[in-house]
Structure formats: structure tokens, C-alpha cells
UniProtKB/Swiss-Prot annotation:
Record-given protein name: UPF0669 protein C6orf120
Classification lineage: Eukaryota, Metazoa, Chordata, Craniata, Vertebrata
Signal peptide residues on this chain, from the entry's feature table: 1-30
Family indicated by similarity: Belongs to the UPF0669 family.
Function: May be involved in induction of apoptosis in CD4(+) T-cells, but not CD8(+) T-cells or hepatocytes.
SS bond list: none
Coiled coil: none
Gene Ontology terms: biological process: apoptotic process
Annotated glycan sites: 53
Species of origin: Homo sapiens
Main location (coarse class): secreted
Keywords assigned: Apoptosis, Glycoprotein, Secreted, Signal
Amino acid sequence: MAAPRGRAAPWTTALLLLLASQVLSPGSCADEEEVPEEWVLLHVVQGQIGAGNYSYLRLNHEGKIVLRMRSLKGDADLYVSASSLHPSFDDYELQSATCGPDAVSIPAHFRRPVGIGVYGHPSHLESEFEMKVYYDGTVEQHPFGEAAYPADGADAGQKHAGAPEDASQEEESVLWTILISILKLVLEILF
């Protein structure tokens, strides 16, 4: 049996008011990203890239930099290299190749300029992207309790105590790259 109309109206009105307040509240906007207060926005880069092509950028800022990229249309992937100004999916140190938002944290010890490659995935004829470049001003804690500040050059070439962990992450990254390449190849063959 249906509820009498007179009793349902107050609940409907309350529900509509609640939904309207959620939609109109300033924190509910999907376009706004939450970032730590220590991060400083340096640049916002927007661009378009054709399927299977690269767009290259150069980063000269010192310190720890965070790149956050979202695809406005299509699917753009992010490749970063300290050794090449034209990184690709075959030649890179850092990558983010997801179907959603991409993010890469560039360590302070990377040699500048850093090459950034934005790749337009072949599954879309054209991809549009927006990349936000942040300076990460957070102070890292040293394993022995002292604060570790960004390297000033004398320390930049030395390996940190977590080198075995870095090696396992690198191996995992290579495996993911191979898996993604195989999946892309299968998708290209099927479609």
C-alpha cells in the first residue's frame, strides 16, 4: 500500500533540500582537487594531443615537484625522465598511465631540466588534458628522527637507505609497463 500523500510531502521536501545543499556546497565541486597546504601551485598547463603522439614539456623548477594531470577528453598518459627531454613509454624514469587522473612526484634529486612527455592514447582520436604543477614544500622525516631538507647538490648523487625498496618498485614498474603495453596491443588488434 502506498503512503498517504500528505505524510510523504515533508520528507520529500527535506530530501530535496538536503540534495540541493550538497550540490551547492563549495566543497562538493568535482573539478577542485584537495591538495596539502604545503603544496604551492606553480603552473596550470592545458593541451591537446593526437592519438599515438607525444607533447613534450620541460621542467626547470628545483625541489620536489608534483604533477597532477587529468584527461578532459580521451586518455592522456604521463612519462617523466631526468635523462631525456623526450621521454616515451620505452624510455622514462617515472610514469602514470591510468584511465583516470594521473599523478607523478618528481624527487628533488632529479637532474634539471626534467623532460615530461604527455602521450595521447590510441584508443581516442584526440585527448585533451590539464596538468597542474605543484612545488611540494613538505619536510621529510629522516629515518633517525632528524628533518631531511632538500639536497643542495653535495648529497644529490648519493643513494638513500631505501635502495632495495627502490629496486623492487622499479621491477614492479617494469612489470606494469609490460602488462599495459600488452593490453594496449590487444586493444589495438581488437579495435
